[in-house]
């Protein structure tokens, strides 16, 4: 007992030292916004156009162009009534001297062609090699920072750590649900804003296309909901399939059965010792037998952990897309996006680590598996940079499908752990507070984004 107390005090001292190191690193990291020179954050982060429209150096030129041509555009929709007046008005502006004798629709199309071309040919303020360096460096930073925190947190699946693990699991479920409902689904529902285009042509188009836009918006929202349900059903199907392939010996397949087999081998050991009066030879087979029941539930429990890794991989992929697209728009915007995603990922990765520990992974294995999900972020960053001229980087189904996976993991794999055993009132209050803290962090991050 005295040795355990001494070990606990020693580990506590090491924890304080590591926390001091993290505070210093955090102070250096959060000084980065000073480099952003007052740049705001884009309201949406998954498309390159969003970040380009946010560039203040390009905005004044685009605004001048829109206001200069406003009357010209407005006149085109009335050419059926006063064609001559509109034609002369366009000639007075001097935009299309060569188009004086041409069809009126030709001039209108030519105008829009120049408008679109100007937007697609907007260039970033850095060369591509520097953009690649900054984007990959930011992605590695986002992957490494949570890893340092995971190294500090003293956590395993032992009985002594069980109350602390349950609190972290509650925090993880709150983070997953908050991430799905407050971050992923809203971004999928409103992927980008058409503010500038709507400002130019609002007087002309809204009266004619309100019904069509309403129909389009309704079908889009329904498709988002279907993809969320598809994510939930897909994760359920994968877990069912894995259980069937494992031979059906996992009747209590979740971690409900993980602590319970431990007393069984103990009874076998004691009975073997009582039956064997002479030596240690009968005890060795008993030890070998006692390891087999422990391995079975561990394999069953790991299903939820690997499902969570798959969802986290897809989520990190979208974060990589955001980083690559933001650095294409400008270095300052890339730094702001990196800090935002880092604040989002730190609590998320801590929750994922707790889920892996509860799933039966060792501490070292859980940390290595968390690093594997960083490959998703690197792949997303590379895809955004390689498709630099391609507009939106992410498929429309990725975000809602990932949200469905997060909802499934939180409600099926994590929350049942909190109801597994009757806990004291104080422990239950801690778990509820941790869950609300996870949701609150996602609210703050969603507001900041």
UniProtKB/Swiss-Prot annotation:
The keyword Disulfide bond does not apply. Its main location: membrane. Glycans are attached at residue 316. Keywords: Glycoprotein, Membrane, Transmembrane, Transmembrane helix, Transport. GO terms for cellular component: axon; endoplasmic reticulum; endoplasmic reticulum membrane; neuronal cell body; perinuclear endoplasmic reticulum; synapse; synaptic vesicle. One of its GO terms (biological process) is intracellular zinc ion homeostasis. Residues 63-80, 249-268 have a biased composition (Basic residues). One of its GO terms (molecular function) is enzyme regulator activity. Pfam families: Zip. InterPro entries: ZIP. Residues 57-121, 188-218, 247-299 are annotated as: Disordered. Residues 81-91, 100-121, 193-218, 269-283 have a biased composition (Basic and acidic residues). The chain crosses the membrane at residues 19-39, 135-155, 167-187, 222-242, 371-391, 395-415. Signal peptide: none annotated. It is found in: Membrane. Belongs to the ZIP transporter (TC 2.A.5) family. KE4/Catsup subfamily. Negatively regulates tyrosine hydroxylase activity. This is Protein catecholamines up. It comes from Drosophila melanogaster (Fruit fly). The gene is Catsup.
